[in-house]
């Protein structure tokens, strides 16, 4: 937001210097990014009147002018400007004057006594470009007739005016105008605010244009009026051109300039149609697929049902709230106009200009929210200026309100405001702050009920009001207090590890941590979780980040691809992050949202060689059992069961559900071949994802005696059908450990598997396999006897027989 200080001070004039005013605005949340002068430094440039103009004797394009510059003597100045004429007043650079450099960083241009084609020139008549006021170099800068001769041009044109450039946060749409900034300045400084003098013009026509609002969800209010007999050739007043230029807007024509001027003045974009180019009445509606519109910027856009339009009886005439159409644009031949000012719902405008790869001042304002209560006043203000500058006769204002925002009062507790701000602010002082801000309120014990004004779209919840109190009270008045807390020792819970312990454990096993967004592509949810109905974001930062994740697998695969694209050949990653699930049983709380749960999970991925390239081991690809071993070490001392099961993201024959104490806690397996092909991975990574709670919880360490007696090891080889899972045999042996005969069994591990290559190989049928287990037994009280060991082994064999196993002969 850019504007000249002089314009601001016509509305509010606090007794502050420019720098003090800048500081006050910045400390109230309106950050002043820069202060600059309206024009570069100049000297000895004054107002002069051209008394006489004669042709140069030796140059057809030059004139010799007699000029009164208030010096007491008539100056002889040679000039080549096409608009030089007797009687006009123009800037005159006297001998010794310095003009701004022609190029950035150059030296000032000094005016010297000189001769042009043999005629002495005692100065120079200046254009706006030579003074660096604009790029207009078509002729001399003609000054108003009442300008005093001899006056310094810096005083005449207020060239020492300061340009403020303010960086507004998106919620401060009420400050996207000079009057909006003035309103804030008055609240901050306490200086009186002078509103714009808007008076209804005299209605001389009994004519309105038929208007139909077909989409109340697009347009809540539409005000317009017919004006006939305007002079489109009228010259925009210099004061208006100056204010527009210093607000960053070039002058176009009187009608367009007036519309732009009121937008910068009051914050409401409007549009001026050429009335004679409108066919019948106009309709405000949503666009239709297949329609197109040529815009004022020359672009032609294809419309659809997501874009609002203004159309007449034949075609679309304007992109609602964004830009007008070329077919009804005003030109120098325009004599009759239709003036429009409307309230467009912010949601109906937001993102539409970006959809067509451009932006406009109108869209920037409407998508943030523009005052819906002042459309008629703004039509009157624009009409007032048009009649003053361009003439004409105005019809009545046609004002249609169909769907305006219903602003519910917002409650703010004084006690909560003081607690959040950190300083005691009395209720009377808060009432004064709300009054200065123009916020109507009612007192209710320790609280204020504030009804947001029509121009404040940023006030919706209690914290918004607390922010307003803090801003106007003054952040600088809030003392800096370091936090104070009691220092106490906390008991360490040995039954739980911290998530940091888990992260360090994974890092110690050669996994690198990665941190990803919690919002992902909807396609990932379908691929990696089989989720057709993900939790969608209302306002995603990007289309490919539009849903909340329910699994970490997609994020890990994305990071893997990123690394592979940079020629990494061995990748081991992990992430400890939250996933987001729907749960009707979840109630709203301080850290919970009703209907949703946010459990933390730990996911990891291994790809490429199992070990870094080295001389001590052969290079082999990482496999399921490598990652399974890492996970078992992570879960220890808890023992996990790995149950064959299918997951949408994992290989159907190489995946398992992870169970701890009979509860499913996660998944492990190779990436599904379909996804490996889709995401262009040369090899399948092995991944796991586990509930963080299962890793954090652990049993208390129990002390045991170190046996002085040697352990006994026995091997058991059994034959089972190939369809029988090893886990089923382990489950049966685990049950046997509770029996008296197996009380000395310390450990059972699988150390060999053999599958027949033919019907007679190894005495096994083609559908069978041989499994060998090593059983470790030990007694802390004495040496184990053979009969005790034999009985334990026999019990284990009998248990495995229940799963279809027999001893191998």
UniProtKB/Swiss-Prot annotation:
NCBIfam families: pheT_bact, YtpR. This is Phenylalanine--tRNA ligase beta subunit. Binds 2 magnesium ions per tetramer. The gene is pheT. Keywords: Aminoacyl-tRNA synthetase, ATP-binding, Cytoplasm, Ligase, Magnesium, Metal-binding, Nucleotide-binding, Protein biosynthesis, RNA-binding, tRNA-binding. It catalyses: tRNA(Phe) + L-phenylalanine + ATP = L-phenylalanyl-tRNA(Phe) + AMP + diphosphate + H(+). Its EC number is 6.1.1.20. CDD domains: PheRS_beta_core (cd00769), tRNA_bind_bactPheRS (cd02796).
């Amino acid at each position: 937001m850019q504007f000249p200080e002089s314009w601001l001070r016509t509305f509010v004039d606090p007794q502050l210097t420019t720098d003090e005013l800048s500081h006050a605005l910045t400390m109230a949340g309106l950050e002043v990014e820069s202060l600059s002068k309206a024009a570069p430094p100049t000297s000895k440039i004054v107002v002069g009147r051209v008394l006489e103009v004669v042709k140069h004797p030796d140059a057809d394009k030059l004139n010799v002018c007699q000029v009164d510059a208030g010096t007491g003597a008539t100056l002889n100045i040679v000039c080549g400007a096409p608009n030089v004429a007797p009687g006009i007043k123009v800037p005159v650079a006297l001998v010794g004057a310095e003009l701004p450099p022609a190029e950035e960083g150059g030296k000032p241009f000094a005016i010297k006594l000189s001769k042009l084609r043999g005629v002495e020139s005692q100065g120079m008549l200046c254009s706006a470009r030579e003074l660096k006021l604009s790029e207009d170099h078509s002729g001399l800068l003609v000054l108003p007739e009442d300008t005093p001769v001899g006056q310094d041009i810096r005083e005449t044109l207020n060239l020492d005016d300061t340009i403020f450039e303010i960086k507004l946060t998106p919620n401060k749409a009420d400050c996207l105008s000079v009057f909006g900034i003035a309103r804030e300045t008055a609240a901050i400084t306490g200086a009186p605010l002078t509103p714009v003098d808007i008076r209804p013009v005299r209605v001389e026509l009994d004519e309105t244009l038929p208007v139909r609002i077909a989409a109340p969800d697009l347009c809540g209010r539409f005000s317009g009026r017919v004006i006939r007999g305007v002079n489109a050739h009228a010259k925009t007043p210099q004061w208006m051109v100056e204010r527009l230029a210093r607000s960053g807007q070039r002058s176009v024509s009187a009608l367009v300039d007036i519309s732009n001027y009121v937008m910068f003045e009051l914050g409401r974009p409007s549009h001026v149609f050429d009335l004679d180019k409108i066919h019948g009445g106009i309709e405000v509606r949503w666009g239709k697929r297949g329609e197109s519109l040529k815009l004022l910027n020359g672009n032609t856009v294809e419309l659809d049902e997501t874009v609002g339009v203004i159309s007449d009886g034949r075609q679309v005439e304007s992109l609602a709230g964004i830009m007008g159409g070329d077919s009804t644009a005003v030109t120098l031949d325009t004599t009759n106009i239709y003036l429009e000012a409307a309230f467009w719902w912010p949601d109906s405008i937001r993102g539409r200009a970006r959809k067509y790869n451009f932006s406009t001042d109108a869209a920037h304002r409407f998508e943030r929210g523009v005052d819906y209560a002042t459309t008629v006043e703004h039509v009157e203000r624009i009409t007032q200026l048009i009649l003053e500058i361009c003439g004409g006769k105005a019809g009545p204002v046609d004002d249609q309100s169909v769907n305006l925002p219903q602003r519910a009062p917002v409650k703010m507790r004084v006690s909560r405001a003081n607690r959040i701000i950190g300083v005691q602010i009395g209720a009377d002082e808060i009432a004064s702050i709300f009054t200065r801000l123009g916020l109507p309120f009612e007192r209710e014990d320790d609280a204020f009920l504030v009804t947001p004004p029509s121009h404040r779209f940023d006030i919706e919840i209690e914290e918004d009001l607390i922010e307003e109190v803090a801003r106007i009270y003054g952040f600088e008045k809030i003392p800096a207090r370091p936090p104070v807390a009691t220092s106490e020792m906390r008991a360490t819970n040995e039954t739980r590890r911290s998530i940091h312990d888990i992260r360090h454990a994974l890092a110690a096993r050669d996994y690198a941590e990665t941190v990803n967004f919690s919002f992902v592509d909807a396609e990932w949810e379908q691929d990696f979780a089989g989720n057709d109905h993900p939790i969608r974001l209302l306002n995603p930062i990007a289309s490919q980040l539009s849903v909340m994740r329910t699994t970490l697998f997609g994020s890990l695969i994305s990071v893997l691809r990123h690394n592979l694209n940079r020629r990494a050949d061995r990748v081991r990653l992990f992430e400890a992050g939250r996933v987001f699930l729907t749960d009707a049983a979840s109630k709203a709380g301080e850290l919970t949202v009703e209907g949703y749960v946010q459990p933390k999970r730990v996911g990891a991925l291994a790809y490429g060689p199992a070990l870094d390239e080295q001389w001590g081991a052969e290079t082999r690809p990482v496999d399921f059992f490598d990652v399974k071993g890492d996970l078992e070490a992570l879960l220890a001392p808890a023992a996990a069961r790995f149950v064959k099961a299918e997951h949408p993201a994992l290989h159907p024959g190489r995946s398992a559900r992870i169970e701890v104490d009979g509860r499913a806690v996660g998944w492990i397996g190779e990436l599904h071949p379909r996804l490996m092909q889709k995401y262009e991975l040369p090899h399948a990574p092995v991944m796991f994802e586990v509930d963080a709670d299962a890793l954090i919880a652990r049993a208390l360490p129990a002390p045991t005696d170190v046996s002085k007696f040697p352990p006994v090891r026995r091997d058991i080889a059994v034959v089972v059908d190939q369809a029988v899972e090893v886990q089923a045999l382990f489950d049966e042996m685990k049950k046997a450990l509770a029996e008296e005969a197996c009380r000395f069994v310390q450990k059972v591990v699988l150390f060999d598997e053999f599958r027949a290559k033919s019907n007679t190989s190894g005495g096994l049928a083609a559908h069978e396999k041989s499994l060998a287990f090593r059983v470790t037994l030990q007694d802390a009280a004495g040496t184990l006897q053979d009969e005790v060991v034999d009985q334990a082994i026999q019990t284990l064999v009998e248990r495995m027989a229940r799963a279809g196993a027999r001893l191998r002969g």
